[in-house]
């Protein structure tokens, strides 16, 4: 292979060991891309690329609809969702569909409707994808200039960015409208153990909403993941939706400033790397949210958080031993600290034992037993309700651990129910996907910057030093 760039397109080139390999009538010399970079053939074919994106959306929506119906078909109303390995129905239940007090599923028909709507949508998207990939115009610039683009056209790219931002803003407002006007959403903090309610008193104070962003990510602070009431969550979506829509309008109406034109790389691969970087951040944040937050991800549907299961076990044994006559306020544990209750470093009364590390847990079954200085001893003696006992015993035995030994004091038993928490699945999958997206971001950012700088990492195999060296044998 004689050139390190394509004579026809001036794109960065993959350097193959075998530069003469031709597949489907394409070879590296004429296209500038190796056989495995299949998407590269669509770089300048906006119509075909549209088809690929629409078809991909169809696959995503088809999976959502099919998996939704699969979960509905296998759903057992008598068991909690998190015991059935469900990952889609918990999201629908959190939005207030089909559930009542305590998160009990009253009606699965809304879930069926959701699955069917997604399947129908996927058929429309699939048809559109096949049409644009096979039958429609290869390029859109001539026939449909509004939908056409050139990757280097900075103004067009920011217009497309603006359209995307407006669509994201509309999505944020869909949640707001559902919570305000269309039946409400599930609130795990509703009195008596959770219920569906309309959110009437939105938090719109910027100091509260943006205060979450300024909090430390550690300990009892917990950054945005620490949000624990729906007024703040829905109010945050009002702010987010407004910012996205206003930012979208701004990007449609303006051209990039000089500093942005200089600082950013303006190529298709650069935009891919920016998108992968953003998705990576989303994945890591979602991982933390589903692992720690029991308001946006109610434990009634997703199972308890790790700290919640640990605190639930301490509470369950406190209830048991108190009934057997133990004085839970003064009993000493094996380390000399309180066996059931102790004080945190700042003086609050907290659960003793290994679960002390999770003393800043907030959960709707536990908060009614707190006073101004942490857990209230008189409430623990007189005010514990049966629903709190039932829920804590249930959460104690459904920790999202996947471990054979004790973690955070939670007794795990290898002969127990065959159980993997949806929290474990969702947190792990989003972390792993976030990581791979980050690697993809670095890869494509490096290639895009190299191409913009006028070079491409790689060795011309015709003159590779190893070719002139003595064979190993």
Curated annotation (Swiss-Prot):
Gene Ontology MF terms in the entry: chlorophyll binding; electron transporter, transferring electrons within the cyclic electron transport pathway of photosynthesis activity; metal ion binding
GO cellular component: a single term: photosystem II
Membrane-crossing residue ranges in chain numbering: 69-93, 134-155, 178-200, 255-275, 291-312, 447-471
Propeptide: 1-14
Annotated binding of [CaMn4O5] cluster, by residue: 367
Topology with respect to the bilayer: Multi-pass membrane protein
Protein name: Photosystem II CP43 reaction center protein
Native source species: Morus indica
Primary gene name: psbC
């Amino acid at each position: 292979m004689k050139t390190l760039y394509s004579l026809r397109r001036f794109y960065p080139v993959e350097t193959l060991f075998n530069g003469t390999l031709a597949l489907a009538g394409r070879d590296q010399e004429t296209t500038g891309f190796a056989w495995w970079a299949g998407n590269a053939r669509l770089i300048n074919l906006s119509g075909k690329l549209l088809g690929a994106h629409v078809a991909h959306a169809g696959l995503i929506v088809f999976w959502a609809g099919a998996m939704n119906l699969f979960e509905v078909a296998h759903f057992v109303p008598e068991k909690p969702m998190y015991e059935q390995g469900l990952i889609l129905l918990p999201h629908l239940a959190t939005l207030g569909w089909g559930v009542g007090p305590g998160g009990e599923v009253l009606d699965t028909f809304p879930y069926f409707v959701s699955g069917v709507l997604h399947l129908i949508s996927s058929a429309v998207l699939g048809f559109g994808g096949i049409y644009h990939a096979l039958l429609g115009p290869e390029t859109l610039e001539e026939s449909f200039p509004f939908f056409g683009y050139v990757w280097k056209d900075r103004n067009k790219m920011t217009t497309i960015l603006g359209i995307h931002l407006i669509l994201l803003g509309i999505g944020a407002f869909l949640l707001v409208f559902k919570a305000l006007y269309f039946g409400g959403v599930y609130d795990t903090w509703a009195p008596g153990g959770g219920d569906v309610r309309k959110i009437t008193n939105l938090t719109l104070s910027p100091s509260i909403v943006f205060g979450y962003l300024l909090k430390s990510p550690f300990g009892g602070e917990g950054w945005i993941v620490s949000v624990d009431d729906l007024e703040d969550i829905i109010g945050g979506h009002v702010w987010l939706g407004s910012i996205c829509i206003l930012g979208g309008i701004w990007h449609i109406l303006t051209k990039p400033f000089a500093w942005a034109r200089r600082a950013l790389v303006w190529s298709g691969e650069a935009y891919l790397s920016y998108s992968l970087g953003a998705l990576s951040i989303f994945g890591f944040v979602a991982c933390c949210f589903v692992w720690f937050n029991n308001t946006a991800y109610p434990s009634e549907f997703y199972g308890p958080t790790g700290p919640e299961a640990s605190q639930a076990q301490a509470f369950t044994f406190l209830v048991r031993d108190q009934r057997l006559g133990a004085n839970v306020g003064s009993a000493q544990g094996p380390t000399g600290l309180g066996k059931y209750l102790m004080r945190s470093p700042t003086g609050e009364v907290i659960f003793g034992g290994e679960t002390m590390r999770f003393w800043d847990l907030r959960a709707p079954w536990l908060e009614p037993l707190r006073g101004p200085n942490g857990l209230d001893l008189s409430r623990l003696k007189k005010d514990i309700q049966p629903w709190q006992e039932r829920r804590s015993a249930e959460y104690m035995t459904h920790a999202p651990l996947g471990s054979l030994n004790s973690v955070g004091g939670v007794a795990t038993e290898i002969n127990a129910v065959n159980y993997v928490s949806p929290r474990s699945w969702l947190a792990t999958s989003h972390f792993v996907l976030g990581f791979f997206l980050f690697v993809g971001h670095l890869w494509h950012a490096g290639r895009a910057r190299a191409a913009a700088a006028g070079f491409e990492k790689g060795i011309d195999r015709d003159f590779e030093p190893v070719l002139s060296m003595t064979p190993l044998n």
